[in-house]
Amino acid sequence: MRNRTKSREYALQMLYQADIRRTGQAQILEEFWQDQETPEDVKAFANQLFEGTLARLPEIDPLISRHADNWDMKRMAVIDRNILRLGVFELMHAEDVPPKVCINEAVELAKRFGDEESGKFINGILDAIHKKSHA
């Protein structure tokens, strides 16, 4: 697995923990990396994604809500909600990652961690957000 893909996976796991446990960011980071042998570049990118996504939730969540027809954020599967958050953060703030790569990486996470419909769900919402932001 490529380093950036692994970083996204780690960031998703931390976002999931933050969403479920409602624990502080510093505690999640400390507990997550404890006893993990991870290359520094993987860890640094994962932390950047995690911290950046959390910092921008006030702008990310309403954006997702506007494009998730008939879906309330609270009713979404926790994993799908956090894949969307991560994907939107990358779409909007990762200037070195092409939008198609951001969307594809999020869809792959959905296929790996979500249910059989997650990939299509994630793809549809992220694609709509991307098209709207570049219209």
Regions found by a protein language model. Name each.
Residues 1-135:
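N-terminal interaction/assembly modules
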